[in-house]
Amino acid sequence: MVNTNKLRGKMIEHGMNVEELSLALGMNRATFYRRLNSDGEEFSIREADMIVNILKLKKEEANAIFFSQFVA
C-alpha cells in the first residue's frame, strides 16, 4: 500500500498538483486520481520510479511513501 498522504504532501512541497503530476507521468488525470484513491495499489513499479524522479525524492522519502507497510 502506498502512503498517499505522504505522496500528496511531497507533491505540495514541490508545487505540483494532481493534474501537473499526471501530465508529467503521461497519465490521464482521472487515472491518477483513481490510483491515489485506491491507496496507490495500482501504481506500477515504472510509475513509482517516475514519481520518485519527478519529485526528486530521497531514498528514505521514497521508501516511506511506496513501502510504508514494510517499514517499521
Where do the PLM segments sit?
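Short, charged amphipathic recognition helices of the HTH superfamily
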Residues: 15-19, 44-47
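Short, charged recognition helix plus adjacent turn
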Residues: 14, 34, 41, 61-72
